[in-house]
Amino acid sequence: MKIGTSAMSPSKTHFTTIDEYIQSFPPMVQERLHQLRQTIKDVAPDAEEAIKYQMPTFVLYGNLVYFAAWKRHISLYPITAEMEASLQELADYTTSGKGTVQFPNDRPLPLPLIRTIVACRVRENRANKEKAT
């Protein structure tokens, strides 16, 4: 399966908005995706929404976070090595060496952890932008 094409998503694989992406899933998954989206917006209200790699993306000082729904979980990208080393709560979830954390659909979304991840990404992106200038 190519990157960004979610396992649960119907045949449409070219989304132009996050709303289109979310609406392509069953109601239970839509609810979780709306909750994730709102949590990201609460932490990074100035981030712009986009679709990149056919995934919902938030952009602030560069790409901030992406998310995708799959058959058994929702993935959030990227999780940096620094986060994996310092955020104890990540140990409760499947992570990959490619900067992904998976939140199983049979458990509530860990909103405090998601807030922390997004806040870390905002700080990282801001610092990277300041280094570049």
Residue ranges and their predicted role:
Residues 1-133:
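Charge-dense, helix-prone N-terminal extensions
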